Amino acid sequence: MDMYDIDFVSVGKHGVTLEEKLKESAQRVVDLADLVSGENFDVALSKHSIELPRVAFGLAIPSLFVLDNEHAMAANKLTLPLCSKIIVPSIIDEWKLMQYGANPNDIIKYNGTSELMHFNNFKFNENVFDDLGLDLPLQKTILMRPEPSLASYLNTDCRKSVLSPVVDVLKEYANILILPRFKEQAEIFEGIKNVTILKPPVDTSSIIKACDLVIGAGGTMNREAAILQTPVISCYPGDTLSVDQFYVDNGLMYRTTDLEDITKQALSFIVNPHKPIELKTDNLFELIVDKTYELGNSKK
């Protein structure tokens, strides 16, 4: 938001332990309620926010919820029963969402994933590496994104990463760029040969497109790489998300958690990247705008 000079108000912060997560979530509800109740909002629009649908429901504001993770049990149970409309990728099984309390009549499906929105006005910066002053001694460059260790749906140690053994092998063959999620993750990879730790905010879209390969233990950046046609390996340590399977099925993502397989495929991809693959999707931007206006008009 800062990078694109967009005015915004930041509300709340994350917790690490279960107790901290609960307390911080409760505080975000309070802070959001104070912010929202002082204004005349017509619609609450969120992407997998736990707090905004709850605040909107309590203040009788219609809410439009964009969902992409059917495995986020806690978040889905706390939000889906309260949402006016839920926009989901067609590949996600709506019966799974109904188990969390979603009304099937409120589910709106589209072909694609939410990451399509990230590239509506994307302009590739071919000089992104030079602009960042990166020292890249090797011919090939791999971008890596560690797992979302602090997320409620993934119970992992934030001081470790599934990418560590991958880095140990591939650092001899390519420059490694690490985009950590928080300070503890950055510390895991500090001081390693041929490894550069990126410090946000950076133009991640241009970095993804400029790299020869992306290896991600999360989700969003992997799907962005698939859309940009950069070879990508997903080693997400949880169950495979349907939105990831969408790109696997279309030949734009390779999914594995086996170290030997990851390194083998990585070396293959940086030498022989796949040819461009046509991806047919719906216009998610138009869908969100249309449904936002529909909900806003329904309140009047």
What residues fall within each predicted segment?
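A nucleotide-sugar donor-handling region in carbohydrate enzymes
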Residues: 87-158
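Leloir-type glycosyltransferase catalytic cores
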Residues: 102-134, 250-300
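Catalytic donor nucleotide-activated moiety binding site of glycosyltransferases and closely related
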Residues: 2-23, 144, 167-198
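A donor-sugar binding/catalytic signature common to diverse glycosyltransferases
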Residues: 44-50, 55, 65-67, 207-244
